[in-house]
C-alpha cells in the first residue's frame, strides 16, 4: 500500500474552538460562560455498591480484588440463605445471570470463601469481586500538526485514521455501508451526549450502573455525571473524558463540523462503569446486561487488566450467545501478555497502529490479537457538557473555551475503530454471528503490516482493517462460516474417586502460527466453556489449580495436552464436553501444617541460616501465629523473608516479627512495595531469637504485639514459606 503521509503536530490544549474551527471556515459552537445548571433529575447516590479502598488487595500478578465482596452464581439457590450461611449480607443481584454480590463479615477473605464454596459444589462459581481499570490513554507531546492531505478531512478536522492509507472509510461509505440501523454499546466512563458531534447519534439512553438508572434526556444524563461526587453543582470531574473520545471514534455524526465516526450512521448507548473510586466487575457485568437488553448489536470495551473474572466471562457469554459482537482493546502494557477481557473466547481484541501503520510501542500483543487499527495521535472528541441553556458545566477535562477535540493515543481507540467497523458490517449483513464479523475483518485486513508481511503476527493480528476490501466483500454473499462452541470437563482422580477439577486453567490454541488462542477457567463442576469461536482443531492445554488463588508450588499442579475440535454452527447447549482426567491438583480445604503446634515461643520450631521452611499455613484457628527459633551471634546481619501472597500466590497478607529471648519486639514488617514481609536486622548479642509469622489482619493493628486487637483471618490459602539468611 502507499506510504503514510508525514504528519506534523500542534498542541490542541492551547487552541480554542473558535481558532480550530475558524481555520476550517466553521462558526464557533462552544457555548458561553458557565451559569447555574437547569434543575437536576439525577438519582441520589446511596453508595451501597461502593468499594472501600482499604478492602482492595493486590496479588502477586498485579490483579486487584475486593477482600470483603463475593460474587456468586447461585445455581438457583437463595441469595439471602447463602449470605446468612456466610454471616454476610446481599448487596445486589443480577437475575439474568443468577448472580449475587454478597458482603462478607470482617476477617473473611472472598477468594478463600469462594474457593471453598466451589469445592463444595454448592454454587456454579464464587469469586472475589475483581477491580477493573480503564486503559489509560498514552499522551504524547503534541507540538506540531501541519498540512493534511485532502483525503484526511471528512467534516472539518483532519482524521488520518480514516484516510485511504489507513482504514479507507470513505470507500465503504460511498458503497452505502455506514452502520445505519446498528446500535453500539460504549461501556466506559460516561460519554458526553451533549457534544455537538455525539448528540445526533446518541440512541437516547444512558446508564448509571451504580444506581441502576437509565437516563433518557441529555440534561438528565449530564446532571447525573455532575452528581457523581454526591452533589449536582454544575461541576464535573476533570478525569471524565475517555468515554467521549471512544464514542466519537465509533459514531461521531457526519454533520459538517468537527470529526466523523467510522460508522457515521450508527447509534450508541453509554454505560458509565468508571466513576470516582474503584470499579468492580459486578457493575461492569450489570452494564453489559443492560446494553444487551437495550438491543445493542456491538459492545465496545476500552478497559481491562490482568487476572480472570468468571463473572465477566458469563456476562460476555450472555452477549455472545445472543449474537452480539464484543470488541475489546488489547491493552497498553508495552509487552506480550494476556489481559482480561482480551483473553476471553469470542471477543475481538484490537491492537493499535501508528500513522506509519507500525505497531504502536505501547500496544499489548500476543496470539489472541485479532486485527489492528489506528491508535496513535488520533483526532477525537473531548467532553463539553453543554447544559440545556447553552452554558457549560465547569471543572471538566476540556477547559472553558477549549475546542471539544483532542489528539489522543491508545488501544482504547483502536478498539472502538474496530467496533465501528463491526457496526458497518452488521448494518450490511445483520444476520452474521460474532465470529463471522471477526473473521470478515481478518480476511479483508492488510496483512503486510506487522512483523509478518505475509499475514498473521502477534503484534497486529491479521493486520490493518481495510474498509475498501471489506466493502467489496459486503457487496457479495460469500461470508465466513459461522462460529462454534467447545466444552471441556476437567476431573481429578483421588483416592476417594473423581472430583471436579475446579479453577483449572483451560487454553485452546488454534493449529498453525495464526491459530487463535482463548483462555478460561473451570467452574465448580469442572466445566470450561468456549462460545462463538473459530471452527477447527485446537491444541487443548489444561493445568490445575490456579496457584494465584490457592497459593503453593508449581509441582502441586497437574497438566494435560490434547486436541479439541470445534464444529461450525455448534452451540454450548448441545455440544458434547471433552473429558480430561488429572491425577493431582485437587484443592485442599483442610491442609496440615507440618510445624503445628508452634503458636507460642515455647513451641517454636527451629530454623537456621541458609534454610527455608516447607509450605506452612496461617490456618486452623481464627488468629493463628507461628513461631520459629534460631541461634545467632552479636553482629550477625540477618534477613528473614516471608514468601507468601506476592511470591507463591494464595491469600496471606503476611506480617513478620523478630523477638529476642525475652519476647521483646526488636523489629516488625508488613508486606509493602510489591513484596511480602522482610526484616533485615543486626543482632545485638549472642543468643536465641524468634521469628513470628502471621497475617496483617491479625497483627498489624498492634504492630505485632497483640493478636487479640486484630481481626480473624483463617484460610487454607494463607500459605507461606519462611527463609532465613545470614548476610555478608
Curated annotation (Swiss-Prot):
Coiled coil: none annotated. Residues 23-148 form a propeptide. It holds the Pfam family Fervidolysin_NPro-like. It comes from the Bacteria. Residues 1-22 form the signal peptide. One of its GO terms (biological process) is proteolysis. Residues 159-471 form the Peptidase S8 domain. Gene3D superfamilies: 2.60.120.380, Immunoglobulins, Peptidase S8/S53 domain. The active site is at residues 188, 242, 412. GO terms for molecular function: serine-type endopeptidase activity. Its EC number is 3.4.21.-. Its main location: secreted. GO terms for cellular component: extracellular region. Keywords: Hydrolase, Protease, Secreted, Serine protease, Signal. It is found in: Secreted. PANTHER family: CEREVISIN-RELATED, PEPTIDASE S8. Belongs to the peptidase S8 family. This is Probable subtilase-type serine protease DR_A0283. It comes from Deinococcus radiodurans (strain ATCC 13939 / DSM 20539 / JCM 16871 / CCUG 27074 / LMG 4051 / NBRC 15346 / NCIMB 9279 / VKM B-1422 / R1).
Amino acid at each position: 500500500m502507499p506510504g503514510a503521509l508525514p504528519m506534523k503536530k500542534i498542541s490542541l490544549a492551547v487552541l480554542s474552538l473558535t481558532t480550530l474551527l475558524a481555520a476550517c471556515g466553521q462558526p464557533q459552537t462552544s457555548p458561553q460562560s458557565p451559569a447555574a445548571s437547569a434543575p437536576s433529575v439525577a438519582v441520589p447516590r446511596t453508595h451501597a455498591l461502593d468499594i472501600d479502598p482499604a478492602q482492595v488487595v493486590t496479588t502477586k500478578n498485579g490483579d486487584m480484588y475486593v477482600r470483603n465482596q463475593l460474587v456468586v452464581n447461585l445455581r438457583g439457590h437463595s441469595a439471602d440463605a447463602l449470605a446468612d450461611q456466610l454471616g454476610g449480607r446481599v448487596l445486589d443481584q443480577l437475575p439474568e445471570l443468577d448472580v449475587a454480590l454478597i458482603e462478607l463479615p470482617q476477617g473473611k477473605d472472598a477468594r478463600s470463601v469462594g474457593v471453598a464454596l466451589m469445592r463444595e459444589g454448592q454454587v456454579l462459581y464464587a469469586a472475589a469481586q475483581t477491580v477493573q481499570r480503564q486503559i489509560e490513554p498514552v499522551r504524547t507531546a503534541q507540538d506540531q500538526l501541519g498540512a493534511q492531505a485532502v483525503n484526511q478531512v471528512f467534516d472539518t478536522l483532519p482524521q488520518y485514521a480514516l484516510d485511504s492509507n489507513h482504514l479507507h472509510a470513505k470507500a465503504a461509505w460511498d458503497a452505502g455501508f455506514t452502520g445505519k440501523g446498528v446500535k453500539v454499546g460504549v461501556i466506559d466512563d460516561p460519554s458526553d451526549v451533549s457534544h455537538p458531534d455525539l448528540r445526533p447519534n446518541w440512541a437516547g439512553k444512558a446508564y448509571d450502573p451504580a444506581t441502576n438508572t437509565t437516563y433518557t434526556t441529555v440534561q438528565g444524563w449530564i446532571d447525573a455525571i455532575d452528581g457523581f461526587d454526591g452533589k449536582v453543582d454544575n461541576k464535573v470531574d476533570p478525569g471524565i473524558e475517555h468515554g467521549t473520545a471512544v464514542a466519537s471514534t465509533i459514531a461521531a455524526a457526519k454533520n459538517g463540523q468537527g470529526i466523523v465516526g467510522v460508522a457515521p450512521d450508527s447509534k450508541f448507548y453509554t454505560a458509565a462503569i468508571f466513576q470516582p473510586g474503584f470499579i468492580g466487575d459486578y457493575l461492569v457485568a450489570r452494564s453489559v446486561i443492560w446494553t444487551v437488553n437495550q438491543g445493542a448489536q456491538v459492545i465496545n470495551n476500552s478497559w481491562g487488566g490482568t487476572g480472570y473474572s468468571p463473572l465477566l466471562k458469563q456476562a460476555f457469554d450472555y452477549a455472545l450467545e445472543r449474537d452480539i459482537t464484543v470488541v475489546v482493546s488489547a491493552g497498553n502494557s508495552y509487552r506480550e501478555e494476556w489481559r482480561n477481557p482480551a483473553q476471553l473466547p469470542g471477543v475481538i481484541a484490537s491492537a493499535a497502529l501508528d500513522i506509519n501503520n507500525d505497531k504502536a510501542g505501547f500496544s499489548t500483543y500476543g496470539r489472541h490479537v485479532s486485527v489492528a487499527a489506528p491508535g496513535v495521535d488520533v483526532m477525537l472528541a473531548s467532553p463539553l457538557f453543554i447544559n440545556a441553556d447553552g452554558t457549560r458545566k465547569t471543572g471538566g477535562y476540556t477547559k472553558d473555551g477549549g475546542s471539544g477535540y483532542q489528539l489522543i493515543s491508545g488501544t482504547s481507540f483502536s478498539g472502538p475503530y474496530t467496533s465501528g467497523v463491526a457496526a458497518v458490517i452488521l448494518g450490511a449483513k445483520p444476520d452474521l454471528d460474532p465470529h463471522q464479523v471477526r473473521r470478515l475483518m481478518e480476511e479483508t485486513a492488510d496483512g503486510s503490516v506487522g512483523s509478518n508481511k505475509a499475514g498473521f503476527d502477534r503484534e497486529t493480528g491479521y493486520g490493518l482493517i481495510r474498509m475498501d476490501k471489506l466493502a467489496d466483500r459486503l457487496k457479495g454473499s460469500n461470508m465466513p462460516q459461522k462460529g462454534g462452541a467447545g466444552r471441556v470437563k476437567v476431573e481429578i482422580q483421588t483416592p476417594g474417586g473423581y472430583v471436579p477439577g475446579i479453577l483449572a486453567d483451560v487454553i485452546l490454541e488454534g493449529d498453525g502460527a495464526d491459530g487463535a488462542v482463548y483462555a478460561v477457567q473451570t467452574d465448580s463442576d469442572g466445566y470450561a466453556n468456549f462460545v462463538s469461536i473459530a471452527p477447527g482443531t485446537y491444541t487443548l492445554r489444561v493445568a490445575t489449580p490456579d496457584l494465584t488463588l490457592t497459593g503453593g508450588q508449581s509441582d502441586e499442579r497437574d497438566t494435560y495436552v490434547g486436541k479439541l475440535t470445534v464444529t461450525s454452527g455448534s452451540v454450548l447447549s448441545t455440544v458434547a464436553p471433552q473429558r480430561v482426567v488429572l491425577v493431582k491438583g485437587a484443592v485442599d480445604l483442610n491442609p496440615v501444617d507440618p510445624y503445628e503446634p508452634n503458636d507460642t515461643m515455647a513451641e517454636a520450631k527451629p530454623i537456621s541460616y541458609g534454610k527455608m521452611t516447607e509450605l506452612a499455613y496461617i490456618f486452623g484457628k481464627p488468629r493463628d501465629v507461628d513461631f520459629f527459633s534460631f541461634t545467632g551471634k552479636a553482629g550477625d546481619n540477618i534477613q528473614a523473608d516471608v514468601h507468601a501472597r506476592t511470591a507463591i500466590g494464595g491469600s496471606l497478607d503476611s506480617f513478620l516479627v523478630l523477638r529476642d529471648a525475652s519476647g521483646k519486639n526488636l523489629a516488625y514488617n508488613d508486606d509493602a512495595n510489591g513484596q511480602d514481609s522482610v526484616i533485615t536486622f543486626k543482632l545485638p548479642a549472642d543468643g536465641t531469637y524468634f521469628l513470628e509469622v502471621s497475617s496483617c489482619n491479625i497483627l498489624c493493628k498492634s504492630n505485632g504485639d497483640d493478636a487479640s486487637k486484630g481481626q480473624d483471618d483463617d484460610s487454607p490459602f494463607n500459605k507461606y514459606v519462611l527463609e532465613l539468611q545470614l548476610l555478608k
